[in-house]
From Swiss-Prot:
Family (UniProt): Belongs to the EPSP synthase family. MurA subfamily.
Protein name, as recorded: UDP-N-acetylglucosamine 1-carboxyvinyltransferase
Organism in which the protein naturally occurs: Hydrogenovibrio crunogenus (strain DSM 25203 / XCL-2)
Its job: Cell wall formation. Adds enolpyruvyl to UDP-N-acetylglucosamine.
Pathway field: Cell wall biogenesis; peptidoglycan biosynthesis
Pfam families the UniProt entry points to: EPSP_synthase
Binding of phosphoenolpyruvate, residues: 22-23
Annotated GO CC locations: cytoplasm
Domain of life according to the entry: Bacteria
Length: 418
């Protein structure tokens, strides 16, 4: 099994190209099931979850082709089965997003209950209840959600609590439903908005994008388009955190700075000099001291849960004490015990991680437990004294494209080993 080996401490310098957002690409790939003609997607990151999604679509009879620029053409005109099997769904929670499109276009869907990261319970009840309100008959049998409907009918649905995948699934179900659907307390994440823009380009009628109330007027059919996936704000934030930790100056390119407003505010509070253009962000931490920052994670546009682990590492080396409170998912401090092995002073109480800054971290063998936790261990390795070996990095490969190559280009001493 692959490991990442990092020789620290590292000084970083230069710029890094940010990939397309995994959390936008996955629902958009599923959304291609709604189109009766081929769709061409660009800026899709080459990640394990994307490969799994393409395999999942292929098992349904979807034709998938890549061109020389690695754009993906998806033709869902001749689907042979409306089932998402356990073998593929178990590795990736986003597979549940096949349910809305299949039910909307074909009136039937059979989707295995999902797997993915080991973070909290993440219930799928909101998806099921929403589709039932739209007229679907749903039963859960032998680990599968089996849904049928003649044609979905528009409904007024309030989602409690806010759910990103729930919003996306019901949005895709609603675009071909008869009449108007209103989704209240909808997630406002940029990735949800990207899916909505994609659906509209295919012929959907969605208004209220970027707000917590989405209104969808059902249409008869959607047709294929060319579409470019938005950049990955969490990948961008991770490289900026690496710059802050290593007291370096790094520019992330091909980003949307407005998607990171809450994060950039915290970098500034931590003592960094942050400058932006239309599509770049530069963080300069040279000759500056890292200050502790208190953080509470909340749905967008507040501070994202997917940047929490990176800021815990920053707080480990900041001058003073700080609290990071996680309100979105359970079990999201699994990286803490590994950071403690590297010399960090962190105490977890419930959903709060309390850190006291230390002078330095020491390299150690550590184990990744989930996607963002594994990124935080790499960041710790970049700044720690000596060798850090991060194992179980298949978690990293689910969400970060070419991570060792990108860090290597910035000057890090990092390589992949078996």
């Amino acid at each position: 099994m692959d490991k990442l080996v990092i020789e620290g401490p590292c000084q970083l310098e230069g710029s890094v190209q940010i990939s397309g957002a995994k959390n936008a690409a996955l629902p958009i790939l599923m959304g291609c099931l709604l189109s009766e003609t081929p769709v061409v997607l660009s800026n899709v990151p080459h990640l394990k979850d994307v490969t799994t999604t393409i395999q999942l679509l292929a098992t349904m009879g979807v034709e998938v082709m890549f061109d020389e620029e690695l754009n993906i053409e998806i033709d869902a005109s001749n689907i042979t089965t409306k089932e998402a099997p356990y073998e593929l769904v178990k590795t990736m929670r986003a597979s549940i997003l096949t349910m809305g499109p299949l039910l909307a276009r074909f009136g039937e869907a059979k989707v295995s209950l999902p797997g993915g990261c080991a973070i909290g319970s993440r219930p799928v009840n909101i998806h099921i209840e929403g589709m039932q309100k739209m007229g679907a008959e749903i039963k859960v049998e032998q680990g599968y959600i089996i849904a049928t409907a003649d044609r979905l009918v528009g409904a007024d649905i309030t989602m409690e609590p806010v759910t990103v995948t729930g919003t996306e699934n019901l949005l895709m179900a609603a675009v071909l439903a008869e009449g108007r659907t209103t989704l209240r307390n909808a997630a406002k994440e940029p990735e949800v908005s990207d899916l909505a823009h994609f659906l509209n380009k295919m012929g959907a009628k969605i208004t209220g994008i970027d707000t917590d109330t989405l209104v969808i007027e059902g249409v008869e059919k959607l047709t294929g388009v060319s579409y470019r996936v938005i950049p990955d704000r969490i990948e961008a934030g991770t490289y900026l955190a690496a710059a802050a930790l290593t007291k370096s100056c790094v520019t992330v390119k091909d980003v949307v700075p407005e998607h990171l407003t809450a994060v950039l505010d915290k970098f500034t509070e931590a003592g960094a000099l942050v400058t932006t253009t239309d599509n770049t962000i530069t963080l300069d931490m040279r000759n500056r001291s890292l200050k502790p920052v208190n953080i509470v994670t909340d749905p967008y546009p507040a501070f994202p849960t997917d940047m929490q682990a990176q800021f815990v590492v920053m707080n480990c080396l900041a001058e003073g004490e700080a609290n990071v409170e996680e309100t979105i998912f359970e079990n999201r401090f699994m990286h803490v015990s590994e950071l403690v092995r590297m010399g960090a002073d962190i105490h977890v109480e419930g959903n709060v991680a309390h850190t006291k800054g230390v002078d330095h971290l020491i390299g150690a063998p550590v184990m990744a437990t989930d996607l963002r936790a594994s990124a935080s261990l790499i960041l710790a390795g970049l700044v720690a004294k000596g060798e850090t070996v991060v194992s179980r990095i298949y978690h990293i490969d689910r969400g970060y494209e070419l991570i060792e190559e990108k860090f290597h280009k910035l000057g890090a001493h990092i390589y992949r080993a078996n």
